């Protein structure tokens, strides 16, 4: 690594010397601890750079994956739309086309990042890691080499110091000893000075080398930090450029979206659809609809309107809409509205029923029969029916009996008792207002065959050639027989066995 820049390392007037205490052979490590500390420090820097390399390599992999995912995302958009003639060619589909194209552009930008990272950042960091590895080797090599030389010279000096000590030992006696040249303290001392001079020279050289290595390490660390800062700056510029592109892509989608009008697609659809409704359409009416069988005789009731029914066993009054059909059924509905009440609540099959005579005082008569809907349990029950007036009552009564006569139905005579009598005092609490709401009739102009008031019912009337038994005959005195049934085989449709 080429180092540059002015050093900011603190200057020293003197190179520190571990032997400044004056010992010939100092008990020190010759800066071995400092060299080890520098080595450990830059090994830490190398690990930090390796971590940064791993980060950018993962970013490279992430960018590649993002490019693939964004490209896959762009292919989710179907354009043009598979259902033809649903949308305008340059309407809402333009938004989807913009989404697809701009998403593909984002994928391309992500792929570009994965291409730029190795050349601009990762390779530089890998070179920096190699420089750190070499620097650590240099610290170890130079530091170890100098220490070995110093230690060798110190050992040599220590050897001659020991020889000098042995040479001086005889001279500590009272009389001077006899010595040879090798044992002469003067010669040995000169040898000590020679070794000590070489030792000090090596120590000084080693101290200078370690100081220079320390200064170089300081500048190396400065350059190392500068490289990392440059790398981060490059990364910031790269990502900022990518984000600006992403924003531009999204803004393009928004621009295409804003160009669409709210009614554009619908206007195009209205032009393409041949059956599109322009303007208002008159509403359909059920009454105006014609269908097969409408207004055929079996579908139109013989008689229809509101009646009040009272059951003998429950003593309960119930007002309902009644319809007597050509099928012979007398149906009861909650209301006349077929939309709300299409199914009957109660029904009597008239040919199987016994019809009593009308009351002489009140507009009512009785029918004995069985509920055809099976909602009322039991075999046969007596049902009293009351109309709004005598005229209405006789229209109902005559319609029922006329139908029985037309079908030539013979009622079995096994039930000789017939319908029970209706008391004249029964239903005294009926409210005339019960019949005021929209009573539906078959025809408001239908000719009635009974227009006399109820007081006139006491006299015998003729309907064809038949005699109608009076209501009083059915009310049963203690000794009178009030049982009566209708016999269709007799003369006329009002033939009764009383």
UniProtKB/Swiss-Prot annotation:
GO biological process: actin cytoskeleton organization; cell-cell fusion; mating projection actin fusion focus assembly
Keywords annotated in UniProt: Phosphoprotein
Family matches, as PROSITE patterns: PH_DOMAIN (PS50003)
GO MF term list: phosphatidylinositol binding
UniProt superkingdom: Eukaryota
Residues that span the membrane, as ranges: none
Disulfide linkage: none
Segments for region (Disordered): 1-23, 416-475
Phosphoserine: residues bearing it: 175, 312
InterPro entries: AH/BAR_dom_sf, BAR_4, PH-like_dom_sf, PH_domain, SLM1/RGC1-like_PH, Slm1_PH
Signal peptide: none
CDD domains: PH_Slm1
GO CC terms in record: cell cortex of cell tip; cytoplasm; cytoplasmic side of plasma membrane; eisosome; mating projection membrane; plasma membrane
Pfam families attached to this UniProt entry: BAR_4, PH_20
Chief place where the protein resides: other
Polar residues bias: start-end ranges: 441-475
Annotated PH domain residues: 300-405
Annotated localization: Cell tip
Primary role: Effector of the TORC2- and calcineurin-signaling pathways. Mediates actin polarization via inhibition of calcineurin-dependent transcription. May play a role in the response to the disruption of sphingolipid synthesis, where dephosphorylation of slm1 leads to the activation and phosphorylation of ypk1 through the TORC2 and PKH1 pathways, which in turn phosphorylates orm1 and lag1 to activate sphingolipid synthesis.
Protein name: Cytoskeletal signaling protein slm1
UniProt source species: Schizosaccharomyces pombe (strain 972 / ATCC 24843) (Fission yeast)
């Amino acid at each position: 690594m080429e180092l540059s820049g002015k050093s900011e390392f603190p200057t020293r007037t003197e190179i520190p010397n571990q032997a400044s205490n004056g010992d010939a052979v100092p008990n020190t490590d010759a800066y071995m601890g400092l060299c080890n500390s520098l080595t450990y420090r830059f090994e830490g820097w190398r690990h930090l750079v390796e971590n940064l390399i791993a980060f950018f390599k993962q970013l490279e992999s992430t960018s590649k994956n993002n490019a693939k995912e964004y490209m896959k995302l762009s292919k989710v958009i179907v354009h043009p739309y598979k259902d033809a003639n649903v949308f305008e060619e340059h309407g809402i589909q333009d938004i989807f086309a913009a989404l697809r194209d701009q998403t593909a552009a984002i994928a391309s930008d992500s792929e570009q990042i994965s291409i730029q990272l190795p050349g601009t950042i990762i390779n530089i960091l890998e070179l920096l890691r190699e420089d750190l590895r070499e620097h650590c080797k240099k610290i170890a090599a130079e530091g170890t080499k100098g220490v070995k030389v110093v230690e060798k010279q110190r050992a040599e000096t220590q050897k001659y110091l020991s020889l000098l000590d042995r040479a001086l030992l005889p001279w500590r006696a009272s009389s001077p000893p006899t010595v040879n040249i090798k044992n002469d303290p003067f010669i040995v001392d000169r040898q000590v000075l020679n070794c000590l001079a070489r030792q000090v020279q090596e120590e000084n050289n080693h101290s200078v080398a370690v100081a220079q290595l320390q200064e170089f390490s300081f500048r190396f660390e400065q350059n190392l930090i500068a490289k990392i800062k440059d790398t981060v700056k490059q990364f910031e510029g790269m990502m900022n450029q990518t984000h600006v592109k992403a924003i531009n892509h999204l803004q393009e989608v928004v621009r295409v979206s804003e160009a669409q009008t709210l009614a554009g697609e619908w206007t195009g659809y209205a032009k393409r659809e041949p059956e599109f409704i322009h303007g208002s359409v008159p509403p359909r009416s059920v009454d105006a609809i014609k269908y097969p069988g409408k207004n055929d005789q079996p579908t139109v009731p013989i008689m229809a309107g509101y009646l009040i029914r009272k059951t003998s066993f429950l003593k309960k009054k119930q007002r309902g809409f009644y319809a007597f059909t050509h099928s012979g059924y007398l149906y009861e509905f909650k209301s006349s509205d077929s939309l709300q009440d299409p199914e009957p609540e109660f029904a009597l099959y008239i040919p199987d029923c016994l019809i009593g005579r009308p009351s002489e005082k009140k507009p009512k008569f009785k029918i004995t029969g069985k509920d055809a809907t099976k909602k009322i349990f039991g075999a046969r029950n007596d049902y009293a029916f009351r109309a709004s007036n005598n005229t209405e009552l006789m229209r109902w009564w005559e319609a029922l009996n006329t139908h029985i006569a037309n079908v030539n139905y013979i009622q079995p005579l096994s039930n000789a008792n017939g319908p029970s009598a209706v008391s004249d005092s029964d239903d005294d609490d009926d409210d005339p207002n019960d019949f005021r709401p929209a009573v539906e009739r078959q025809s408001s102009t239908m000719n009635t065959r009974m227009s006399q008031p109820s007081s006139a019912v006491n006299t015998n009337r003729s309907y064809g050639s038949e005699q109608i038994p009076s209501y009083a005959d059915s009310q049963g005195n203690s000794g009178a027989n009030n049982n009566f049934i209708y016999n269709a085989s007799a003369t006329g449709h009002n033939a009764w066995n009383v």
